[in-house]
From Swiss-Prot:
It is found in: Synaptic cell membrane; Cell membrane. Component of neuronal acetylcholine receptors (nAChRs) that function as pentameric, ligand-gated cation channels with high calcium permeability among other activities. nAChRs are excitatory neurotrasnmitter receptors formed by a collection of nAChR subunits known to mediate synaptic transmission in the nervous system and the neuromuscular junction. Each nAchR subunit confers differential attributes to channel properties, including activation, deactivation and desensitization kinetics, pH sensitivity, cation permeability, and binding to allosteric modulators. InterPro entries: Neur_chan_lig-bd (IPR006202), Neur_chan_lig-bd_sf (IPR036734), Neur_channel (IPR006201), Neuro-gated_channel_TM_sf (IPR036719), Neuro_actylchol_rec (IPR038050), Neurotrans-gated_channel_TM (IPR006029), Neurotransmitter_ion_chnl_CS (IPR018000), Nicotinic_acetylcholine_rcpt (IPR002394). Residues 1-22 form the signal peptide. Neuronal AChR that forms heteropentamers composed of two different type of subunits: alpha and non-alpha (beta). CHRNA5/alpha-5 subunit is only able to form functional nAChRs when co-assembled with another alpha subunit, can be combined to CHRNA4/alpha-4 or CHRNA3/alpha-3 and CHRNB4/beta-4 or CHRNB2/beta-2 to give rise to functional receptors. Interacts with LYPD6. GO terms for biological process: acetylcholine receptor signaling pathway; membrane depolarization; monoatomic ion transmembrane transport; neuromuscular synaptic transmission; response to nicotine; synaptic transmission, cholinergic. GO terms for molecular function: acetylcholine-gated monoatomic cation-selective channel activity; transmembrane signaling receptor activity. It comes from Pan troglodytes. Glycans are attached at N155, N183, N229. It catalyses: Ca(2+)(in) = Ca(2+)(out); K(+)(in) = K(+)(out); Na(+)(in) = Na(+)(out). This is Neuronal acetylcholine receptor subunit alpha-5. The chain crosses the membrane at residues 255-275, 282-302, 317-337, 430-451.
Length: 468
């Protein structure tokens, strides 16, 4: 009986066991999936719990120290991302920087094991105590950086790197414009805390330029920081000063300002190469003078108005304007000499004839002027016609002598005019070489020393950057 009854029951029992096992497997898979989904939510709960515990009794206006005499040490650094502009007229430097600050907040410490292994959290800077470090020499009224999140570690280390756009005051020295170097400083310090409460530690003497975006007009030669202290009757106040030595890239001003000015100065020299009787010489000089005046107005719009120093390009323009003014005066004098005659002026002095008709032409490589007046006069005085006893011949000779004297008088007048014209040519040639020499020496004397100094600063900086 037991054997017959056990046959049909065995398949049923096996089917029941498989069904129960399948249900248990589904339940286990569902439980595993539920545990996988609940793991991230548990981390978020841990972080929520951590933030509630940290900021439950936290007051961000209170300096986070355990004892009253403890001071907070702020590790301070600066990273520059862009030199936006240098306004010479208003003497401002605009920069985009990052203020790197790090300190210990004793009220923001926790044990990572109690909060699911969380070691770092990020909270808005408005929720924690932050040092009131500002830029002292700000020029636009914005003394602090942007409110961004702080990074807090479990040991209480708070790192805050807010970006900031600053317009800082910068005394512009335009002596060597456009080959100038400027030294602009940015001074940071606490606005209310003294050194016994908040001390600033310079993290790195060099400004971080790894993310710097090049400027098309200025190049940063060096950017270094130094720490200082300001003391008064009761307290001392630490501060950090960053000095930016920036160098102007002069290519634009060289092409569109200096080279045209040099061209105008040499164009003035060519005035003396025109014929002495040309009235257009005055027009050319006047046109050059007007052009230089326009250049002066352009420079006046760029550089700051200061009576302490005169910029290099301003000195050159003033030099060229004096140069052109003298050329106008000399040209007027030469034209006056050119149009002189015996009927309008007295006879030429012997020393004038000797210097301008004999000596200077040889020195100026001009063809020697033949003194036809004296030559023809000597030939006339040395020549004598035969004496005729006949009255008709005497009468004819008297007529010839009269005609000869008249012709000689006209020749004398013509030769005096030609002598004055030749003196005008000598003056033009003399001033041509004189003004050319002065123009070359003046241009080289003004620009070469400055360019040499500028190159000596530029080359070592690039060599040092290449070695790095």
């Amino acid at each position: 009986m037991a054997t017959r009854g056990s046959g049909p029951r065995a398949p049923r029992l096996l089917l029941l066991v498989q069904l129960v096992a399948g249900r248990c497997g589904l339940a286990g898979a569902a439980g595993g999936a539920q545990r996988g989904l609940s793991e991230p939510s548990s981390i978020a709960k841990h972080e929520d719990s951590l933030l509630k515990d940290l900021f439950q009794d936290y007051e961000r206006w209170v300096r986070p120290v355990e004892h009253l005499n403890d001071k907070i040490k702020i590790k301070f650094g600066l990273a520059i991302s862009q030199l936006v502009d240098v306004d010479e007229k208003n003497q401002l430097m605009t920069t985009n920087v990052w203020l790197k600050q790090e300190w210990i907040d004793v009220k923001l410490r926790w044990n990572p094991d109690d909060y699911g292994g969380i070691k770092v959290i990020r909270v808005p800077s408005d929720s924690v105590w932050t040092p009131d470090i500002v830029l002292f020499d700000n020029a636009d009224g914005r003394f602090e950086g942007t409110s961004t999140k702080t990074v807090i570690r479990y040991n209480g280390t708070v790192t805050w790197t807010p970006p900031a756009n600053y317009k800082s005051s910068c005394t512009i020295d335009v002596t060597f414009f456009p080959f100038d170097l400027q030294n602009c400083s940015m001074k940071f310090g606490s606005w209310t805390y003294d050194g016994s409460q908040v001390d600033i530690i310079l993290e790195d003497q060099d400004v971080d330029k790894r993310d710097f975006f090049d400027n098309g007009e200025w190049e940063i030669v060096s950017a270094t920081g130094s720490k200082g202290n300001r003391t008064d009757s009761c307290c001392w106040y630490p501060y950090v000063t960053y000095s930016f030595v920036i160098k102007r890239l002069p290519l634009f001003y060289t092409l569109f300002l200096i080279i045209p000015c040099i061209g105008l100065s040499f164009l003035t020299v060519l005035v003396f190469y025109l014929p002495s009787n040309e009235g257009e010489k005055i027009c050319l000089c006047t046109s050059v003078l007007v052009s230089l005046t326009v250049f002066l107005l352009v420079i006046e719009e760029i550089i700051p108005s200061s009576s302490k120093v005169i910029p290099l390009i301003g000195e050159y323009l003033v030099f060229t304007m004096i140069f052109v003014t003298l050329s106008i005066m000399v040209t007027v004098f030469a034209i006056n000499i050119h149009h002189r005659s015996s009927s309008t002026h007295n006879a030429m002095a012997p020393w004038v004839r000797k210097i301008f008709l004999h000596t200077l032409p040889k020195l100026l490589c001009m063809r020697s002027h033949v003194d036809r007046y004296f030559t023809q006069k000597e030939e006339t005085e040395s020549g004598s016609g035969p004496k005729s006893s006949r009255n008709t011949l005497e009468a004819a000779l008297d007529s010839v002598r009269c005609i000869t004297r008249h012709i000689m008088k006209e020749n004398d007048v013509r030769e005096v005019v030609e002598d004055w014209k030749f003196i005008a040519q000598v003056l033009d040639r003399m001033f041509l070489w004189t003004f050319l020499f002065v123009s070359i020496v003046g241009s080289l004397g003004l620009f070469v020393p400055v360019i040499y100094k500028w190159a000596n600063i530029l080359i070592p900086v690039h060599i040092g950057n290449a070695n790095k």
